[in-house]
Amino acid sequence: NAAALGTDSSPNGNTFTVNNLTSIDQSTDYPEVNFCTWNPLRFWNRSGTLQKVSFDNGNLRAIFDDNGYNEYAFASIGVDTGKWFCEMKAEDVTATANTRIGVLNMDYTGTGNPGDQSTSVSYMANGQKRVGGSNSSYGASYTNGDIIGVALDVTNNTVTFYKNGASQGAISITAN
């Protein structure tokens, strides 16, 4: 609608003043259902072998074959500066599962679990953190349906995990 150029149709009420624009400058904006998608190219199990995993929902969900190994998938695009944040929904977490959400640096070899090497850290479903192969007290436990946030601050070498929006505390990480 060229007559409504600059009018926000979302519930946010961000209407803008239009200067030197005409209907030819107008394009439709579809802000709903925008998600960044994960580019998963590496998936491993604890033995360091390639793992059968499938992805659905625009690569927003990883489905593992549940062969008895600890299984994980890595994003393929690393970062080396700045501050980054993502959130994920915990699914299929059980009392006996070794569910972890973590951050790995470029030197991670793909063997062992996230947090087993000094080049990685993880937030475990039981509320512990794992850094350099050692578990220690960290935050609240999480289970199915919880939203886990990960704030990576490469500039200050910290990662902070969030459970349903509540910070669990900053963890120092090895830069690389």
Question: Residues of each region from the PLM?
Answer:
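PRY/SPRY (B30.2) beta-sandwich protein-interaction domains
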Residues: 1-176
